[in-house]
Amino acid sequence: MEGCILADSRQSKTAASPSPSRPQSSSNNSVPGAPNRVSFAKLREPLEVPGLLDVQTDSFEWLIGSPRWRESAAERGDVNPVGGLEEVLYELSPIEDFSGSMSLSFSDPRFDDVKAPVDECKDKDMTYAAPLFVTAEFINNNTGEIKSQTVFMGDFPMMTEKGTFIINGTERVVVSQLVRSPGVYFDETIDKSTDKTLHSVKVIPSRGAWLEFDVDKRDTVGVRIDRKRRQPVTVLLKALGWTSEQIVERFGFSEIMRSTLEKDNTVGTDEALLDIYRKLRPGEPPTKESAQTLLENLFFKEKRYDLARVGRYKVNKKLGLHVGEPITSSTLTEEDVVATIEYLVRLHEGQTTMTVPGGVEVPVETDDIDHFGNRRLRTVGELIQNQIRVGMSRMERVVRERMTTQDVEAITPQTLINIRPVVAAIKEFFGTSQLSQFMDQNNPLSGLTHKRRLSALGPGGLSRERAGLEVRDVHPSHYGRMCPIETPEGPNIGLIGSLSVYARVNPFGFIETPYRKVVDGVVSDEIVYLTADEEDRHVVAQANSPIDADGRFVEPRVLVRRKAGEVEYVPSSEVDYMDVSPRQMVSVATAMIPFLEHDDANRALMGANMQRQAVPLVRSEAPLVGTGMELRAAIDAGDVVVAEESGVIEEVSADYITVMHDNGTRRTYRMRKFARSNHGTCANQCPIVDAGDRVEAGQVIADGPCTDDGEMALGKNLLVAIMPWEGHNYEDAIILSNRLVEEDVLTSIHIEEHEIDARDTKLGAEEITRDIPNISDEVLADLDERGIVRIGAEVRDGDILVGKVTPKGETELTPEERLLRAIFGEKAREVRDTSLKVPHGESGKVIGIRVFSREDEDELPAGVNELVRVYVAQKRKISDGDKLAGRHGNKGVIGKILPVEDMPFLADGTPVDIILNTHGVPRRMNIGQILETHLGWCAHSGWKVDAAKGVPDWAARLPDELLEAQPNAIVSTPVFDGAQEAELQGLLSCTLPNRDGDVLVDADGKAMLFDGRSGEPFPYPVTVGYMYIMKLHHLVDDKIHARSTGPYSMITQQPLGGKAQFGGQRFGEMECWAMQAYGAAYTLQELLTIKSDDTVGRVKVYEAIVKGENIPEPGIPESFKVLLKELQSLCLNVEVLSSDGAAIELREGEDEDLERAAANLGINLSRNESASVEDLA
C-alpha cells in the first residue's frame, strides 16, 4: 500500500510549505510559487502562451470602447479607433424625417456602474448589467435649433472577468462564429455536357444584394444581380455609363468579352438600366429614374449595401486596388465591378497575373472557400453589435413616425426615442440565440474550452444538414489557428472547433498565429503574427528544426511547409519563418494529453473531449505525468484565487484570506464554498497558503474545483495493471479495487437545486406552510415552523422539502358540512397538498436554503409572493456502472469492484488500484497510455542516473536536473516535445528501489504480479505503472431508473417514456415478435392492455392485487379507441363487432368516479375497502 499512501500524502501540501515529494520553484515557470514540474522539453519557447480568454475579453472591450482597448489600438497604430457601440451610433446618425426638416443623431455611448456584483446576480436571478447612456441631439433644420439630452438606452449585459455573462442568474457564454468573410470569390467548375472549365465570381457583402458574374459554356460573360435572372455583363457596364467603345478599349484583349458585346442588344445607358429594372422588378412599369435609383441603392448606398471594413479589405487585396491606403468606404465602386470582370476574364483565359490601373501586379487564381484566409470569426463583440444594429434600425422607424406625428416645438430627443426595440433585441440575443449558450461548468477546463470554441453553426452560418465533407475537413490553413483534434463526435463533427493555444484574432476577425522571423538563415526571437493568406506566401520551418547557439540551422536542408500544406526540404537560406512552439497547432485540452504524438487522432479527439466531462473529486490530485499546460489552464479558467499584488498573508480561514500588500493596503479574498455549478457539480475553494507566508503578484493562493496547487487536476494517479482478469474487463470494462471506494479516492459531491414558488391563483393565494392536510408528523419531522426543511436533514425520494398548500375549488356543501363550518369556522377550508418533494431516485443532505419574499422587497416575477430554493448535496462514491477514462481516449465502464485482498499485488504486497484490458490498446493505436504508465511509475518511484559509470547516450540529451528525481516527482512531457522512447527505457532501468531495496518494475516496464486470491504469481510479467484516471459525468446514479405506476399520456393513456418523465420501458414491435415466438400469449396480452392503456383494466388489476384476488379479464385498450376516432375523423364509418357479429357500443370515457378511484388507488392504498371499483362502476 506504500504507493497509495505516498500519492495521498500530497493532498496536505501547500504552496508555502515545500517538501521533498513536491519541490517548489518558480525557476521553470513565469507564475510565482508554482509547483516545479521537471520537464522533458528540449526546445526553448520564445513566446509565452497568450491570455486564454483574450478572444472573449478583447472583443467585448472593443464593443464598449474601454480605455484598455484604446491603449492597445494606439499601440497597434490604429488611426482614430472606433468602438463597436460608437460605430453603430455613427451609422445610424442622423435619423431624418421624410421631408428632411428634422434630424436626430447619437454619440458618446457610456456606462454607469453595474447594478449588483456577480455573486448577487447569480443568487437573485438578476442580469449582470450596467445602464447605457448616449448623447442624443435633435436638430430642427428649418430654424437651426439644437436640443441635446442624455438618454438612457436600457441595461446592457456586461462581461464578467471570466469572459461570461450572467443572464437571469445563469452563467452563459457567447461562442465565436466562423463565417465566410465578405469579399470577392472566384470559383472553377467543369461543365458536365461539354467538359469545359467554367469560371464564376461572387461578390458577397456583409449586408445587401449579391453580385455574381460567370462565363457559360457558350463563352459569354453574364451577370446575376441579387440572384435574379442572368443577363450579359455588358448590360451592367452600360447601365453604369460605359459606352461600347469604352468596353472594347478596356476588354478588347478578350475574345469572350467581344462576343458578349456582340450578343448584347441593348443600346445606351437608358436601355440597359430599363433592362436591369425589368429583371429585378418584373411586373412594375420601368422608368429611367426608378431604374437608376434602384441600381444605386443596391450597390452604391451605405444604407442598403455594406461590405464592412473586412469586405473592403478583402476586395482591395484580391483585386490589387487602393493598396496601402486607409479604408474609408464600405460600398462597391464602379472600379471594383470592372476589376472583378477583368479578373474573371483573365482567369478564364488561363492568365496567371494581372496588372491593375494603379500598376500593381496581382496573381490570378481561384479561391478556396474553406481556407482560413476566407473564413473569419464573428467574436462576441461583433455578434452583440449586429444585434444592437437590428434593434436600432427598428427604433429608427419609430423615431421617423414620431417626428411626423408630434408637435415640432414640443419635440425633445427623449420624446422621440423608444428604447424597447433595442432592449428586446439584446434580450433576444442573450436568451435565445444559438450562439449564446448555457456555460459548460463541469470542471474548469470545460468552461475554458467553451469560451474558446469556434462554431460554424448559427444565424448567418451553416446548418449541420447542408454542411458537406469539405467544410468539416481539416485544412492546412488551420495550422496554429484551429485545433485539428478537438471537435465533437456526431453530426457536428468539423463544424465546431477550438482555438489553438497561441492563436489570436486580428481586428478584421481573421485568426493569426505567431512565428519566429528567420533572417538570412538565422532564427531570431522577433515574433510576427500571420494570417492564413499571408502565411501562404512564405516558407515555414517546424519548431523542432535543430538550431545552434547562434540561431543558425544545423542541417543544410530544412523540412518546411509551403502553400497548401506541401512539405519538402529546402536550403536553410530560403526559410522565412519558424514555428514558436511544438504545441502551436493544438488547443488547450489537446495540449494536456501527454504523449499525444503516440496516439491515433480519433482516440486523441475522444481524450480531449472526455477531459471536459471529468467531475471534480472530493480531493483533487495533480497528474504525476503532465504536459506543462496544467498551471496556465487552471489560472486562466478563473476558478483558482490569484493574489493581485505582492504581500504577506495576514489571516487564513476556510472562508477567506487576508493579504497585507507591500504598499500597506489590505485585501480580503473570499472563498467560494460548496457552490453548485451549472452542471450540478460542486465548486469549492480551499486556501493553500498559511498565515505569515510571502506571496507574489500572480501567485495562486487558493485552489478551486479540479485544481491542486494551482494546477489543473481532473482525476487521480492510480496504480494500474494492464491485463485481462477472468473476463471481467472484457469489452473495455474496468476492474477497480475497493480501496478507492473506502478511502473516497474517486468520490465526488453533486448538488441539486430544487425550487418552488407560492403564487396568487384565481381561488386565492398559495401558502408555504407546515400545516399540510393528511400528512403524518413523522413526515413533517424535518420541517421547521415555516414548512421548510432544516439544513443538515438527510432526505430521500418522496420526502417533503417545502410544504405548500393550494386552494381547491369550493364544492357544493352538504347540510352536515355547512353545520360543521358554522361551528368550527374556516378550519375545514378545502386545500390540496402541492408540496415540493424530492424527485424519484434522488437523495442527499440539505446544505442550503434561500427564501425570497415580496414582503422582504426581493424582486420576484409577477404573481409570485414567495420563492424557496433548497440545495441538496449528494456524496457519490464510485460504483459499478460509472464511466472512467484516461487522457488518451481509453474509456470504460466499471464492471466489477474487487476487495483489496483479491486484487493482483506486486512483490512487496502493494495491490494495484485498477485493471485495464490489454485488448483496448493495439487496434485503437493509443500507445500514449502505455508510455504514460511507464513514466508514471518512474515519477512515483523516483530515479537516479549513476554518472560514475558514465552517462549513457539517452541521458546525455537530458538537462542535468533530469538525471535524478525524488519519489513522487511531478514531471511534464509537452506534446510533440516530450520524453522519447529511449529515455523512458533508460529511466525505467534507473528507478529507485523501494524501502526493502527491491526494484519492482523491470527495464521493460513490466512487473511480476501475484494473484490476490491464490497468492500464486501470474504466468507472465504484466505492465504496471501509474496512469491518470478521470471519473466522468456519466454516472450510473443518474441513468438507472425503474417504474411501477406513474404518469400516462393524455391521448393514448399509455405510460410516458424516459427517466425525466418517470416513464416506463418501451416494449416495441421486435419485442412483441420475441413474445410471439415463445408463444407467451398471456404475457403479451397483459403488456398490450392492463400494463399499458386499458384504463379500466389497470385500476381493476391494481385493486385485485391489493386485495389478493384473481386478475380480471382485460378490457379494450385506449389506443384502439384513438384509432377509431382517427378513422372517423377521415369520414369513415367504423363499427366494432363482437365474435358473433353484433355491434359493440364503446362507452365514451368511462365513469368519472372510476377515474377518481384510479387516482386514489395510485396514491393512497389505505382507502376505505367498501368503495370497490365494481360498486363505483
From Swiss-Prot:
Residues 17-32 have a biased composition (Low complexity). Keywords: DNA-directed RNA polymerase, Nucleotidyltransferase, Transcription, Transferase. It is an enzyme of class 2 (transferase). InterPro entries: DNA-dir_RNA_pol_bsu_ext_1_sf, DNA-dir_RNA_pol_bsu_external_1, DNA-dir_RNA_pol_su2, DNA-dir_RNAP_su2_dom, DNA-dir_RNAP_su2_hyb_sf, RNA_pol_bsu_bac, RNA_pol_bsu_CS, RNA_pol_bsu_protrusion. It comes from the Bacteria. Its EC number is 2.7.7.6. Residues 1-36 are annotated as: Disordered. Disulfide bonds: none annotated. GO terms for cellular component: DNA-directed RNA polymerase complex. GO terms for molecular function: DNA binding; DNA-directed RNA polymerase activity; ribonucleoside binding. It catalyses: RNA(n) + a ribonucleoside 5'-triphosphate = RNA(n+1) + diphosphate. One of its GO terms (biological process) is DNA-templated transcription. DNA-dependent RNA polymerase catalyzes the transcription of DNA into RNA using the four ribonucleoside triphosphates as substrates. Belongs to the RNA polymerase beta chain family. The RNAP catalytic core consists of 2 alpha, 1 beta, 1 beta' and 1 omega subunit. When a sigma factor is associated with the core the holoenzyme is formed, which can initiate transcription. This is DNA-directed RNA polymerase subunit beta. The gene is rpoB.
